[in-house]
Amino acid sequence: MKSLVTVFSLAVLGLSACDVTHPVAVVGPSNTVYRGSATATFLEGGWFQVNNGANTCRGQYNPATDSGMVTFPVRCTNGLTGVGKATYDNPRSGGGEIVMRDGTRWKFIFGRQALAV
């Protein structure tokens, strides 16, 4: 029994250290494309960062709810801030929208489909 507990504990520790990184594309005003990546950590949520050369935007999120949705604050180096909402289509991809405080709506895409933007 003790060895079973040890094996289970090691498996949980191994999984908790797994970070998975996915490509991200964000399409802002005038079809300005930001590219970057999102990193998800098992049971801890994750973070993303994108840039378009002149501006960088980033956000951090908690694990998805049962609905597969995450909500996250966004902050950009040009001073813009907003709130994003994204839904997982599957464990490796999905998308949603970021609504900035200035009222603009930005498209948020992560996973393989972000590579096509």
Predicted regions and their residues:
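N-terminal Sec signal peptide cleavage junction
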Residues: 15-18
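Helix-termini ("caps") and immediately adjacent flexible loops/tails
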Residues: 26-29, 117
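Mid-chain, structured segments of secreted extracytoplasmic proteins
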Residues: 63-100
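Post-signal-peptide N-terminal segment of Sec-exported extracytoplasmic proteins
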Residues: 34-71
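Short polybasic amphipathic segments
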Residues: 22-27, 45-49, 72, 94-98
